[in-house]
Regions:
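Membrane-interface loop-to-helix entry segments
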Residues: 157-214, 244, 267-271, 395-408, ...
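C-terminal membrane-solvent junction of multi-pass transporters and transport-like membrane proteins
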Residues: 26, 157, 169, 186, ...
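TM-loop-TM module centered on a large, flexible mid-protein loop between adjacent transmembrane helices
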Residues: 99-101, 106, 137-148, 218-223, ...
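Extracellular loop-to-transmembrane helix junctions
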Residues: 47-152, 273-276, 280, 474-482
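Helix-loop-helix connectors at the membrane interface of multi-pass transporters/channels
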Residues: 4, 98-102, 129-160, 194, ...
Length: 522
């Protein structure tokens, strides 16, 4: 046996031990390399999807100075990501958030973390798919299937495009991890190239200096309790909505080779590349815009309009095609992460019909039932949130719940650090003595941003007629209902059924049985 073969065998044995620690047996096929895990993380964040979808909101809320929210959010999310890197190295298993919380706290907290993340991921799947409407009709008017003279034509057309995309992601995720990873990796490669090309093209066409990022754009913040700071906190939504989901790189741990080392690297690389490329796109877009006071730039599809203004129809259209590719692979990654989380929870029989949801297809090696179920729920959500007002509320609470899920990991982790019971993997990623301050900053950041996201602002939750008080308080009410109702169901019904489903339970060998007890014969 060569040294490489021996190392591979040792790594495979270690991979199996990581799953064995949770009482599971290996069920998923390990076929993903380091680039695949990196691609999963960066495609979930998706630089082009997020910046093109929300540039208009940031610019319209706080002017060009909103750009500073990008590095600010990066620093805050980096604190969270560093904590996750330790966890990814220590517990490389599917459904990262859920299983990490289970090891850090108790079954109730872990279920709540998983439920929060799962519901938010399904909503995000629908929300990301709707981003096609802002780009496809700009490329070719034929993508506007609904005549413009029809009431709510854009919203209805967006639902149709989004539903078609979700059908696609459902089929790809159901037909095999390798196929999903190949499409995702190819899409990410193209997205990264397009992002670099876009940065260069915008830099060539700048018409003002970088000092523009200190300009508030004449935003009238006189009526706000915090003045311009209040406007900036609202504009931060445009960055907060983008830089999350980096934990997806660790959600594929049971399908990855050597996840202990690959997952932490993938998490940090995904966040870093997104920060650098996204930050430069936003900066040069602001510097190259012909007229920053153009109302079209502060309307839905603002960055798409800017690109066509600056680069012209031909080159601009090519960039917009790259944006569409980014949206597709982003939705593919969001769907994949939701499937792994549903699989992890149902494997513990912690979801209704858990034994069905965690079934692995012998043909494709994937949880097909979970893939299809999540796709159907997301498509139903598209029609439920048909109203732009309701859509804004629902997508906003998805981000609130993701930040809440992160807190349900970082807070128990801090408790273990303070108690001295947290032990990172000796040969894996470790923050060392920086672990405590980084963990504290991650919690402070997550808590403050959760409050900021949920604050009942008219301009976010109740921006257009008809005005309703319950929409304005939607960021508080809906997460409360989802968390409260979900946990009530778990506490009264599901927790009494909790236990690893037989299909995925570790099979004990005589060596696993304590020596003070007789070995039971079959």
């Amino acid at each position: 046996m060569t040294s490489d073969e021996k190392a591979h065998k040792q790594a495979s044995a270690a991979d199996a031990e990581d799953i064995d620690e949770f009482g599971y047996k290996p069920s998923l096929v390990r076929s993903l390399g380091s680039f695949h895990t990196f691609a999963a993380g960066i495609s979930y964040i998706s630089i082009l999807t997020g910046t093109f979808q929300l540039f208009y909101f940031g610019l319209g809320s706080a002017g060009p100075a909103y750009w500073w929210s990008w590095p600010l959010v990066f620093v805050g999310q980096l604190m969270v990501a560093l904590c996750f890197c330790e966890l990814a190295a220590r517990y490389p298993v599917a459904g990262s958030i859920y299983n990490w919380s289970k090891r850090l706290s108790n079954h109730g907290v872990s279920w709540l973390a998983g439920w929060t993340m799962l519901t938010a991921s399904i909503v995000s799947l629908a929300a990301v798919a709707l981003a096609l409407q802002a780009t496809l009709p700009e490329i070719w008017s034929g993508f506007q299937f609904i005549p413009e003279d029809v009431s709510n034509a854009e919203a209805l057309n967006g639902v149709i495009l989004a539903a078609l995309l979700i059908v696609f992601t459902t089929l790809i995720n159901a037909f095999g991890t390798k196929l999903m990873a190949q499409i995702n990796s190819t899409g990410v490669f193209l997205e990264l190239i397009a992002a670099v090309v876009l940065i260069i093209l915008l830099a060539i066409n700048i018409v003002r200096g970088p000092q523009i990022v200190f300009d508030t754009g004449g935003i009238d913040a006189s009526g706000r309790p915090l003045g311009y700071a209040g406007a900036f906190l609202v504009a931060m939504f445009a960055s907060l909505y983008v830089m999350y989901g980096f934990d997806t790189a660790s959600s594929l741990a049971e399908e990855s080779h050597d996840p202990r080392r690959n997952a932490p690297k993938a998490i940090l690389r995904a966040l870093f590349f997104s920060f650098v490329l996204g930050g430069l796109i936003l900066l040069f877009a602001i510097m190259s815009a012909p007229d920053l006071s153009d109302p079209a730039l502060s309307s839905l599809g603002g960055l798409q309009t800017l690109i066509l203004q600056v680069l012209g129809g031909g080159v601009g259209t090519v960039i917009l095609i790259a944006v569409v590719i980014a949206v597709v692979v982003c939705d593919l990654a969001v769907h994949a992460a939701a499937i792994r989380l549903a699989f992890a929870m149902s494997r513990d029989n912690n979801l209704p019909a858990g034994s069905k949801l965690c079934t692995i297809s012998p043909r494709f090696g994937t949880p097909v039932v979970s893939s299809v179920t999540i796709g159907i729920i997301a498509i139903v959500l598209l029609f439920v949130t048909f109203s732009p007002q309701i859509y804004t509320v629902v997508t906003s609470i998805a981000i609130i719940m993701i930040y809440t899920a992160y807190l349900l990991v970082t807070i128990p982790m801090l408790v273990q650090r303070v108690r001295g019971t947290w032990q990172p993997r000796p040969d894996g990623f470790s923050l060392g003595r920086w672990g405590l301050p980084v963990n504290i900053l991650a919690i402070l950041w997550g808590g403050f941003m959760t409050v900021n996201l949920a604050w009942p602002r008219n301009e976010v939750y109740n921006a257009s007629e008809p005005f309703h008080w319950y929409l304005q308080w939607g960021g508080v009410l809906l997460p409360g209902v989802i968390l409260g109702a979900g946990f009530a169901y778990y506490w009264t019904v599901q927790r009494h059924k909790t236990g690893v489903v037989a299909e995925h339970a570790r099979v004990e060998t005589p060596a696993d049985v304590p020596t003070d007890k007789p070995v039971q014969e079959a």
